[in-house]
Amino acid sequence: MSTEGPQQPMLVAGLTQSKKLIKVGMASSAFIAKDADAKIINLVAELCRVNNVKCDMAKTKKELGIMCGIDVDCAVCVTLN
C-alpha cells in the first residue's frame, strides 16, 4: 500500500507556454494575476473560454510567482491535465 498522498498538479508558468498549453488542450486550469496587464488578462481569459479551460484570478504577480515556485513575478500559469 502506498503511503504517498495525492500529487499536486504540475504548474507551468509564463504567458507563452501557458497560451500553447491552453490551445493544444493540455491545460486543465489557468491562473491570471489581477495586477497583470489588461491585454494579458483579456487574452488568456478569452483563450480559456474558447478552449473550455477553467480560469481563476490570483491576487498578485508576486504571489503567483511564489505559487509556481519561481523567484520572479508571474502574470499567468496553468495546471496540466
Regions found by a protein language model. Give the residues of each.
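Hydrophobic/aromatic ligand-binding patch that stacks against planar heteroaromatic rings
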Residues: 47
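Alpha-helical transmembrane segments of helical membrane proteins, especially in multi-pass transport
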Residues: 31-32
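Aromatic/hydrophobic pocket-lining residues that form π-stacking "cages" and hydrophobic walls in ligand
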Residues: 44
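Short, flexible micro-motifs
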Residues: 17, 28, 68, 72
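Short basic, glycine-rich beta-strand/loop surfaces that mediate nucleic-acid
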Residues: 50-81
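Short, glycine/polar-rich helix-capping loops at beta-to-alpha or helix-loop-helix junctions
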Residues: 40-41
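Ribosome large-subunit tunnel/peptidyl-transferase-proximal elements
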Residues: 1-26, 37
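Short beta->alpha linker loops
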Residues: 35-36, 59
